């Protein structure tokens, strides 16, 4: 292990002990926010410190075994040889685990997200595929125990959606869905195609972490134009009687958001403001990521929604993720929400990128 990484680990052990002492300080205990923040830091440091303590123990065992191998007694040397073999086998997995624990944490990983799906090229077929993608993500969310709320929808003429915006609520949502942003391409024979020709259509998916109250974007009221209108779609007679739907335009950026999910104008406004904050944050993050990507080409995680990331080929039953050259002949299962086999390799690739950067 590099000396620079060892030094970083020693510093983290010191900080862990320091935070542990602070958590017993009556002044800290009296300050709820400070106590909560330190408690969070302590729990984040703990797995790193425990792993590093195991690593140090193994290093000591190796040194001790090597010393015993110089012993004159043959039985002692044989025992030391076995101990050395065992300890060295433990060392590499611990080093790998420590490096992964040292990887920079994405502060958005535990956040809820706004999931946007928009039909692109392909007309009606693209809108139908938007509906298929929404069903895929909904099934995946069900398996993960997440909740999906529809913020706004624009239905396609022959099924699916021209545009759909949802909020996905649950544990670790962003960490699992963040690599889904981009263009999703479908190749299949549309139901309306009499000649049996394969058509290619596309949809774009955007995954935006929901902003915390503490990091909510500062929005100047003078920069906002707020319009009310009557909600369309389900909701019974009530929908037609009140202008409960909200449209907010952020004039400096031209970003427009709508919410017509709730019957209450106040609730729709709150959701629309939250979506607007996420959109502005996401636009800023995309700009930063583009600047970073120009310096270091990363296969995964650019989050550019115009980038073609995946193809769903129905005649072949194939799903291909172009970023990591992953091909799976499990289209039916994936469209039913079995996304882990696609998502986990992307997470692994991202971690490999980070480990390479850490080693440098």
Swiss-Prot record:
Predominant cellular place of this UniProt entry's protein: cytoplasm
InterPro entries: PCRF, Pep_chain_release_fac_I, Pep_chain_release_fac_I_sf, Prokaryotic/Mito_RF, RF-1
PTMs per UniProt: Methylated by PrmC. Methylation increases the termination efficiency of RF1.
Record-linked SUPFAM superfamilies: Release factor
Lineage: Bacteria, Pseudomonadati, Pseudomonadota, Gammaproteobacteria, Cellvibrionales
GO cellular component annotations of the record: cytoplasm
Domain of life: Bacteria
GO molecular function terms attached to this record: translation release factor activity, codon specific
Pfam family name, one: RF-1
Cell compartments where the protein resides: Cytoplasm
Family per record: Belongs to the prokaryotic/mitochondrial release factor family.
Protein name per the record: Peptide chain release factor 1
PTM annotation (N5-methylglutamine): residues: 237
Role according to the record: Peptide chain release factor 1 directs the termination of translation in response to the peptide chain termination codons UAG and UAA.
Naturally occurring in which organism (per UniProt): Teredinibacter turnerae (strain ATCC 39867 / T7901)
Key words, A-Z: Cytoplasm, Methylation, Protein biosynthesis
Cytoplasm is among the record's keywords: yes
